Amino acid sequence: MSRKQLALFEPTLVLQALKEAVKKLNPQAQWRNPVMFIVWIGSLLTTCICIAMASGAMPGNALFSAAISGWLWVTVLFANFAEALAEGRSKAQANSLKGVKKTAFARKLREPKYGAAADKVPADQLRKGDIVLVEAGDIIPCDGEVIEGGASVDESAITGESAPVIRESGGDFASVTGGTRILSDWLVIECSVNPGETFLDRMIAMVEGAQRRKTPNEIALTILLIALTIVFLLATATLWPFSAWGGNAVSVTVLVALLVCLIPTTIGGLLSAIGVAGMSRMLGANVIATSGRAVEAAGDVDVLLLDKTGTITLGNRQASEFIPAQGVEEKTLANAAQLASLADETPEGRSIVILAKQRFNLRERDVQSLHATFVPFTAQSRMSGINIDNRMIRKGSVDAIRRHVEANGGHFPADVDQKVDQVARQGATPLVVVEGSRVLGVIALKDIVKGGIKERFAQLRKMGIKTVMITGDNRLTAAAIAAEAGVDDFLAEATPEAKLALIRQYQAEGRLVAMTGDGTNDAPALAQADVAVAMNSGTQAAKEAGNMVDLDSNPTKLIEVVHIGKQMLMTRGSLTTFSIANDVAKYFAIIPAAFAATYPQLNALNIMRLHSPDSAILSAVIFNALIIVFLIPLALKGVSYKPLTASAMLRRNLWIYGLGGLLVPFIGIKVIDLLLTVCGLV
């Protein structure tokens, strides 16, 4: 069953949910929902009264008590059904993942290189640090990092996307997930987890975990609902002596019906379903949330930290121009830049090699045959390069190269500073190339801002969310791209420490921060952020630090995550407003019916002109039960979300759900009363 094509009311899920709803009638399950526990007690009490009346042990209308008791039990069942259906949908999504887990064998290499001798071992015996070889047609047996090779991988079993992806050693696409299939070529993989700790295992365990923990907002709302329930319970309890003193005591059955109709049973019955459905909708967007708390936090986020590359821009920066320093030939710069990039497997590094080949017919050379040493890029050094024949060639950010030159006793030329500024003002990224302490020139890397991204940021700004672009570019380049994209602020020349400091700064101001990351160097910031979306293609450290994982590895998904979180909070708030507004109409139905015989003046409140006291009370109880069923689709799908300001959103929801909560019960109760009367049931 596809996670993305799961129908709202799948017949098998509905049947299973009905069974679970009956199982949840036990006191232990009901106690977890205090509002519905009161309804459960009322159902039990009215059932006992009905039996006593039917046996003649107690005076009264046994048929009326049976009808009230039956519909109270139906109310509890409907609330159980809503929760069970939401849980069933999540479990069905998890079951689709279980099919991915297969008992398979793996080729465990004795040495960490392609062509080494291999032993055939069961996949579930692989340990962290083991090296395995997978070839076309094989299922990847474990989560890990590609250390050699490149291949096309079908990840549809995990992500639901049919298009294959490229996984290769080096760069940002080295992470692989157990359960995915190799379509072509081969990979040498180092396992990064032990059995039972794979990403797939954690996904299944997370959805099928023993008991979903309530989020802080959910707990706060539950406390409010309990307080309202206690108030209405005390108010209802005081009505019996008033009616008895008036000479016409109201029956316990009527008082229980009144209590159930007054307490917020609608939101009480749907609250758990809303929380479960929020995580389910996140999974439908191919994002795995570790808890409901993470989904809820996404709805409260007011600062988004967005990586420039891949989120704001298309992410395929390409070398577009070699700009030599004064006194340096362009070919000399191109040759040095290509040498520094020969072992650089990033798209930028490869584009430099290709540009040098196109401009000056400089062919690629093998690093090993040159007896050269490649110096990889690190977040701390912010440069990479090569050591060859006593030549030390580096390429990197302006500041990093400036420090490198000065540390080696050289001087950074003023004309190169001017060229860097010129490239940056055009919105391109300048990389400076140096040999020893001599600066050779600048490489311009061009990227393109995504279409429509400026409008999306404008919508976020309207919602009160601040957008901050994170980039390793210098301030001039960052400022040019930030202005073009329409973000509110930017952090240039970003390091892991700078990102962490920025998050803490915003949190100290009372803001909630969301960010994405995929590298080990992102882990500290991901761990600090309130909403941290790790990319599935990222490192194991990033996935463990985040509280969400995006299976599509799409950094732009962060905006959708915020939308889903806000939709969950709006759904909870809207249905709470609707539930409390409901009470007003039910008050006008039951109070006159219950007490008009004692206080005839209350007949003035019977504005719906209901047929009789019994039909009025029964109609209100029936409506109270049925409204839960009618609102289940809204609880599971969420209310319609529009990017509006907080005040505009509040006004909109008050009109729709506040006014709707007042009017719908008047209409519903009147229609039910007419049907009961026409059918002669009262």
UniProtKB/Swiss-Prot annotation:
Family matches, as CDD domains: P-type_ATPase_K
InterPro entries (alphabetical): ATPase_P-typ_cyto_dom_N (IPR023299), ATPase_P-typ_P_site (IPR018303), ATPase_P-typ_TM_dom_sf (IPR023298), ATPase_P-typ_transduc_dom_A_sf (IPR008250), HAD-like_sf (IPR036412), HAD_sf (IPR023214), P-type_ATPase_bsu_IA (IPR006391), P_typ_ATPase (IPR001757)
Catalytic activity: K(+)(out) + ATP + H2O = K(+)(in) + ADP + phosphate + H(+)
GO cellular component, one term: plasma membrane
Main localisation: membrane
Keyword Endoplasmic reticulum: no
Family listed: Belongs to the cation transport ATPase (P-type) (TC 3.A.3) family. Type IA subfamily.
UniProt subunit comment: The system is composed of three essential subunits: KdpA, KdpB and KdpC.
Identification of the protein by name: Potassium-transporting ATPase ATP-binding subunit
Lineage of producing organism: Bacteria, Pseudomonadati, Pseudomonadota, Gammaproteobacteria, Enterobacterales
